[in-house]
Amino acid sequence: FNCLYLNPIFTAAEYHRYDLLDYYHVCPNLGTDDDFRELVSEVHNRGMHIIIDGVFNHSSWYFFAFDDVVKNGENSRYKDWFYGLKFPVKRPEDGESPSYTCFAYERKMPKLNTSNPEVRDYFMDVCRYWLEDFDVDGWRLDVANEVDKDFWRAFRSVAKKTKKDSVLIAEIWENSERWLQGDMFDSTMNYEFRKVCRDFFAFGKINAREFNSRFVDMLLRYPFPIVQGQLNLLDSHDVSRFRSLCAQNSADSGDSSAVDKRFRLAELCLLTSVGTPSVFYGDELGVVGFEECDYRAAMPWANPVKDNRDLFRELIKLRKSNDCFIHGNFRVLDYDERGKFVFARED
């Protein structure tokens, strides 16, 4: 099925909304709760699904529980909701060391104690609420490897009981085998796919022989049904745009047509490989950028940098034309030292 995956939609303090204030309401900058219900309904009417981003490893330092800790110190009923508290807890100025554990050393994102039963119960209700009241179809789960495993087992149980066909996709950057044993997640974001494609298509730093070796190793890492469900990607909100990486190849010497060719070949690989392809917004309109403020820029509806919509339409049509692209086996046919790599998808 086709699915929209949305970055955090909840009320937050920062523009990226990975520091959540309120897990029960849509951020007013995006619209209202009813607007979101309407979006979900329209998505479903088109035969599509929609999943949302769950950030349960950390919160905003203005999240109600942390705010209570700041105000009431050791008397706060929420003092066990967070890691590494040293009283008195305050919100430090830029450059000051926080008196609590943070995510990625970001003082505005205190780390939640997901092994705490109260914390667990709170977020189990959040899970249930969006699946039940808004009819979303699943969750993409942020920084999943830093969250307590029993938390995820409970989360899966609640999600599947609430909506049996809900999908749980975890953000795991490395080997995900221990997370894909059937007790936590259905899939993980396959950043290894991006790394291999980056080195071959964009940078040209490996030849077809090494690409074959790394690509096949990636496919053999998990049982085939799990490989089929891996979320393959070239771009996301956490990495520089793939098209920008293609432009870094010194062999092209600023040749835009060569850059476009590298990008198109990588997208061809993405849409025809084993796994579930994920296309990041803006790739179809040529969005570029190395820095966060650029690769997360607004969609250039009126002035596309490079209009690739026909490319994506063609590749998506190709993928849908034959079930072998979804369920079929993967077989390498040929490769050579000049960069040729040929594979087949077959029933």
List PLM regions with ranges.
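Substrate-binding cleft of secreted/luminal carbohydrate-active enzymes
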Residues: 267-288
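Hydrophobic faces of well-ordered beta-strands that scaffold small-molecule active sites
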Residues: 4-6, 50-52, 139, 168-170, ...
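The substrate-binding groove and active-site-proximal loops of carbohydrate-active enzymes
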Residues: 18-33, 105-121, 137-146, 194-208, ...
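Carbohydrate-binding surface patches
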Residues: 333-347
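Substrate-binding/active-site clefts of carbohydrate-active enzymes
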Residues: 2, 9-133, 155, 161, ...
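Short, solvent-exposed turn/loop segments enriched in Gly/Ser/Thr/Pro and often Arg
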Residues: 2-14, 54-63, 142-148, 171-176, ...
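Active-site-proximal helices and loops of the catalytic beta/alpha 8
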Residues: 40-44, 58, 70, 132, ...
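Conserved, mostly hydrophobic/aromatic
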Residues: 6, 23, 43, 53, ...
